[in-house]
């Protein structure tokens, strides 16, 4: 199990191993120099942190944890650029400090905002201060309304049924399916309908919808390259390489989205002139909430706020569901436990059709599915949607473990690494075990959000957490109620790709058998 769990780490690109002809002494020398610089930076950072007078006075003393990483070594510092350092941590106390205790001193910062601006704009995930507070207030209200909850549940069920139909056709012909692609399209269709009030139909093969979805995904990947390329601004100025491609993808996204916003704004203007009924999608709600007294609509603001929600919802749920099915295939007994729980909670009967089953899949039934909730949470522990989360320090600070932080420094906490730390989760931290989330009565028990950080914590905790769980539970319940899933080939190696979110690399080929 541990070998499988570490496989993703072992597949990082390498050169010169085992007599590979690509080996070069010059390359080895460069690699050695980089390693030496990294080690020296780490050593000096630790020495400096432990030597600061104020830091030493505030330094916490931790007892050793058997079988785990000593807490004193769960935070380290590396030199990023001249005058700026990055601090990385897996310490829940530090996470709590930056996300809640000293929240005003940490945020996205100008560096992240500048890198993400072309796609995220001034949306909620790329801004701080009053802009963030305003959007948070509007979005928080909408995500708690009964109308949106009912509307989104209907959309989730409709798209889960469409996905089940696609799976049924493949199962009847004994064909394997790429579930990563299917889930990406199904969840994109769902969130797009909820956000914009229009069916994208990528699961059915709509040309325009798929073109938008492809451009949308590509733009996210090209944005990530900016973190790795210090010369991205020059490339953007010259309109070459990845920046040229990113510009093309953003153009496709913007043309599609602005057309929808203008059409919806005109529709609402005409509708409100006749009656006071409102639509349930987020775009309509935001238009009504942000339109000025003079009737002016800020299309750019609406584009940013709604696209940010689409980005968060689509990537988190599709990726998590893909990892969930992968782990369920590795642990067939988990599938059967979920099936038994779903059947008991819905009480739909063995012969129920998909429509009859969806009718029985009420909020009350979903709330009874503690084991399914635990299995999804265990998936997020091992494969969080965002594997590395960064903040920028706005004022000099000292962390609870004694590290000094200067204004402008980056502070990173690592959900992926934290989910695999033995000092946090025990000796079986690498194992997929949903039972760790259940009490002796089989009832789901939540962990501290500063230990289980998949949804952030503090004032910026994910407002769509319940929304995401509801979508994942509906999709998972429908799929496992009607099908048994297996990996196409047990030897298929599944690892992650480098991106803003922790998605499965390449495809996830599964076979399905109707129950």
Regions found by a protein language model. Give the residues of each.
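Cytochrome P450
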Residues: 2-38, 79-87, 147-158, 168-193, ...
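Conserved cytochrome P450 K-helix/beta-meander segment immediately N-terminal to the heme-binding cysteine loop
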Residues: 413-443
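Conserved cytochrome P450 K-helix E-x-x-R motif and the immediately C-terminal K′/meander segment
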Residues: 67-74, 255, 259, 357-403
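Cytochrome P450 heme-binding "Cys pocket" and the immediately downstream C-terminal segment
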Residues: 332-334, 411, 465-503
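Central I-helix of cytochrome P450 enzymes
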Residues: 187, 191, 249, 253-257, ...
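Cytochrome P450 catalytic-domain helical core, especially the substrate-recognition surface
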Residues: 32, 64-67, 84-85, 93, ...
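N-terminal membrane-proximal hinge/A-helix region immediately C-terminal to the signal-anchor transmembrane segment
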Residues: 2-134, 155-166, 249, 391, ...
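Conserved cytochrome P450 catalytic core segment spanning the I/J/K helices
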Residues: 144, 188, 248-321, 349-362, ...
